[in-house]
A protein has these predicted regions:
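Conserved beta-strand/short-helix segments
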Residues: 1-243
């Protein structure tokens, strides 16, 4: 017969999370083994409205199958209206959090993403390792719209990359040791070969091993805004070419 899936827990914000009105706890969620990550993109951090935060929960923290909060993550350089936590992903002991509205220099809404590791700074400290941005990023790209991680490779979507406000969209691939140990350097920019304005390529991304899939919800195929998804392979077209 079919497997039966029953609800085990309601993961509402626990008291220790200090969630407030309109924090948007659960904006994005991800899980790996017994560790889960929840984004709260509209969380006010200090005096910064809508800076955003993310919570790490462990299955047996506070008791068997309790799913207790073990860490609150915020951007080390966070500011207002960055929406940190709008996208989250986890793979083993690594977490990545998107902040698509982050202002970089004078470029508003250029966007960024932050990588954390479980034991960075000490056992279970979940310390920030690196803030990553697109090398060719520009205002209104919304880099960090989506994130995914598999082992030592990260993929980040930027839905408006490629033009002022209405770009085709792009996704960026980063490798943990590109440019040095734990440097998380950019190794590839992925774009749709048939992309057009407002396709929103990069609105969703996923990676598993050597394969990446990118969503483009507004791509015109046989009808306007029908949507499409694009699959890329690491070694298609050459080693680490991501064709």
């Amino acid at each position: 017969g079919f497997d039966t899936w029953n609800q085990q827990a309601l993961l509402a914000p626990p008291p220790e999370a200090n969630c407030g009105t309109n924090d948007d706890y659960g904006t994005a969620v991800a899980i790996s083994g017994d560790t889960a990550v929840f984004g709260a993109q509209s969380d006010d951090v200090g005096i910064n409205a809508n800076q955003g935060s993310a919570y790490i929960l462990e299955r047996n923290a506070g008791g068997p199958d309790n799913w207790g909060v073990v860490k609150l993550l915020t951007a080390s350089d966070g500011g207002p209206d960055e929406f940190f936590g709008g996208s989250v992903a986890i793979s083993g002991d690594k977490v990545i959090i998107g902040a698509s509205n982050d202002t970089i220099g004078a470029a508003t809404q250029r966007g960024s993403a932050y990588i954390y590791e479980r034991n960075n700074g000490g056992p279970d400290k979940w310390g920030e390792v690196k803030k990553i941005v697109a090398l060719d990023g520009a205002e209104d790209d919304l880099f960090g719209s989506s994130v995914s991680i598999s082992n030592n490779i990260v993929v980040v979507g930027a839905i408006y990359s490629g033009g002022p406000g209405l770009g085709n969209g792009a996704a960026y691939v980063f490798s943990q040791n590109a440019g040095g140990g734990n440097n998380w350097g950019q190794i590839k920019k992925l774009v749709a070969p048939d992309g057009a304005d407002s396709d929103l390529f990069g609105i969703s991304v996923a990676i598993s091993g050597d394969s990446v899939v990118i969503g483009a919800t507004e791509a015109d195929v046989s009808a306007d805004g029908q949507g499409a998804a694009y699959v890329f392979e690491r070694s298609l077209g050459g080693p680490s070419n991501w064709g």
